[in-house]
Amino acid sequence: MSNSKIYFEDRSIVTPGDLIAEGDFQIPWSPYYYKIGNKYYSSITGLIEVKENLFEIVPLEGHRYIPKVGDTVIGLIEDVEIYGWVLDIKSPYSAYLPASSFLGRPVSPGEDLRRYLNLGDYVIAKIETYDRTINPILSIKGKGLGRVSSGIVIDIPPVKVPRVIGKNRSMLDTLTSETGCEILVAQNGRILANCATKMIEEALVEAIQIIEKESHIKGLTEKIRKFLREKLGETKNDSATKTEANT
């Protein structure tokens, strides 16, 4: 690795064809770069993240979710079949959830699966199988997986997921601590949030929209913290004023 070199600093913007690095790097395959010999080139316009002699390219916009085994996703039921459900996971490929995985038993002949999951329902699941030759197969075996029964689902471009989470979960921790909401960020660009009030929920949505639009800006975590404190401070003041007016 001593002869390897990365030509961009952390959080620099790269464009298609840029020579990113040269040498021997043990990094996972990604559609966002290509390799010629021992040289790595960017295939998109994005942000490069450098850490401990490794790099990752995060697209700035566009791009659908590329399934990866083990990822947690939030899928939307778009079809009910005899032995399972077809889900939209914001990918070029629809995903399939076998009923046996959801029910924990084989499907009975003539059983109506709409009793359990119907069109428009959201499901938290993991990508169990995917190899580019078949559509992703989902599983809900595991803690916290299954049908979404409460909260709101917020859609963002999948490429913005790393920014919403932040380095060492810094952005996600800020969103959680400042709002008190329970927040799950799925890898396919859907966020499940359970908040105490509608006003807090709306403030969270606004904060996420800011992150989405300004994901390339440094100091964004602190900006979001200040925004939420000001926004929720205004909300609390408005609530107090209304309470005083009614007494």
From Swiss-Prot:
GO MF: poly(A) binding
Name of the coding gene: rrp4
GO cellular component terms attached to this protein's record: cytoplasm; exosome (RNase complex)
Residues annotated as domain KH: 149-211
Name used for this protein in its record: Exosome complex component Rrp4
Domain S1 motif: 70-143
Coiled-coil regions, chain positions: none
GO annotation, biological process: CUT catabolic process; exonucleolytic trimming to generate mature 3'-end of 5.8S rRNA from tricistronic rRNA transcript (SSU-rRNA, 5.8S rRNA, LSU-rRNA); poly(A)-dependent snoRNA 3'-end processing; RNA catabolic process; U4 snRNA 3'-end processing
Entry-linked Pfam families: ECR1_N_2, KH_6
Location in or out of the cell: Cytoplasm
Assembly and binders: Component of the archaeal exosome complex. Forms a trimer of Rrp4 and/or Csl4 subunits. The trimer associates with a hexameric ring-like arrangement composed of 3 Rrp41-Rrp42 heterodimers.
Annotated PANTHER family: EXOSOME COMPLEX COMPONENT RRP4 (PTHR21321:SF4), PNAS-3 RELATED (PTHR21321)
Keyword entries, A-Z: Cytoplasm, Exosome, RNA-binding
Family recorded in the similarity comment: Belongs to the RRP4 family.
Record function comment: Non-catalytic component of the exosome, which is a complex involved in RNA degradation. Increases the RNA binding and the efficiency of RNA degradation. Confers strong poly(A) specificity to the exosome.
